[in-house]
Amino acid sequence: MASTYKDAGVDLDVYAESMSRLPRLMHRTFSPRVMPSDGGFAGLFRLDFPGKLFARNYEEPVLVSGTDGVGTKLKIAQTMNQHETVGIDLVAMCVNDLICTGAEPLFFLDYVAMGRDDPARLERIVQGISDGCVDGDLALLGGETAIMPDMYGTDDYDLAGFAVGVVERKRLVDGHLIAPGDVVLGLQASGLHSNGFSLVRKIIADHGHQWSDVIDELNQDTKTPETLAQVCLRPTKIYVSAIRSIQSHYRVKQVLHGIAHITGGGIEENLDRILPPGVNAEIDPNAWTPNPIFQWLQQTGDVATSEMRRVFNMGIGMAVVVNEYYAASVASQVAKAGIECSPIGRIVEGSSKVVYKEA
């Protein structure tokens, strides 16, 4: 009997149906800087552009790139058949890294690997990616969908993303201007974001909880009760508008000295990446209230505070180091962009470390 690709687990007709659903999700993210390339093998994007609304004319442009994934948060989405927001997570993890340099986001590429083709599910995933690109002001320029039945389980999939941005060299933010007296501002996280989910899943499993459970401690301030899965699947916050509001209202080098995306490793292992020699960042853990999910996980799993701080963002999704004189003004400006922001620490003399100021 003749062998076919379909017999091997890849149906090209179903794949074609999947691909037919994606162009509209891409086109809604386009600006006039995206050049038409229907049927092309690569996406095209103009760096300089003369149009009035999107005018760009760079003097010394530096391209900035970043790549990331969503990790085992995807296991919860797959278990609960909730795929609409993991694409937002994917974009957020990439673009939030990108803007730590002060870069303007340009475009995004995605990679989706699946155990079997499912046009409806793929559309839901890419809808989230498209939503994230709109929020992050990125053009979803292209991507790859790989059907690999021998690599993944029937309902399994994995996501990877790649973002590109640009920054004028003279406006590059790299932390070298951070100095004693600067203030560390914390931008509030939506929750767990996309790190630490192997520990989250272990705690849930070890203590007999189900993803459909409604936990009272996690619903004190919610109008509509949320399940444990809904709390954990809250999408990673995208901070493009917040950082852009700082850049557009202040002289960057005078005000904005450093930006750190708080992901795996927590505040300590991410903020110290941008500290120059001779300074420490002294963080006051009492300066903000972490999202309820963190306290619940710590108590349920009997997790040490040091471990919590190393694995999770603890409610701070991004840290911004600013000139002390402008700290209150910057915090107010970020709040206008819809992100809660408050001082969480100071820069002091030291040895390029993050230290917690314990009570």
UniProtKB/Swiss-Prot annotation:
Pathway as given in its UniProt record: Purine metabolism; IMP biosynthesis via de novo pathway; 5-amino-1-(5-phospho-D-ribosyl)imidazole from N(2)-formyl-N(1)-(5-phospho-D-ribosyl)glycinamide: step 2/2
EC number: 6.3.3.1
Entry similarity comment: Belongs to the AIR synthase family.
Catalytic activity: 2-formamido-N(1)-(5-O-phospho-beta-D-ribosyl)acetamidine + ATP = 5-amino-1-(5-phospho-beta-D-ribosyl)imidazole + ADP + phosphate + H(+)
Protein name: Phosphoribosylformylglycinamidine cyclo-ligase
Localization annotation: Cytoplasm
Keywords tagged on the record: ATP-binding, Cytoplasm, Ligase, Nucleotide-binding, Purine biosynthesis
Organism: Rhodopirellula baltica (strain DSM 10527 / NCIMB 13988 / SH1)
Pfam family name, one: AIRS
Cellular component terms per the entry's GO annotation: cytosol
Annotated TM spans: none
Alphabetized Gene3D superfamilies for the sequence: PurM-like C-terminal domain (3.90.650.10), PurM-like, N-terminal domain (3.30.1330.10)
PANTHER family, alphabetized: TRIFUNCTIONAL PURINE BIOSYNTHETIC PROTEIN ADENOSINE-3 (PTHR10520:SF12), TRIFUNCTIONAL PURINE BIOSYNTHETIC PROTEIN ADENOSINE-3-RELATED (PTHR10520)
Gene Ontology annotations of biological process type: 'de novo' IMP biosynthetic process; adenine biosynthetic process; purine nucleotide biosynthetic process
UniProt cross-references to HAMAP family, sorted A to Z: AIRS
A GO MF term: ATP binding
Main location: cytoplasm
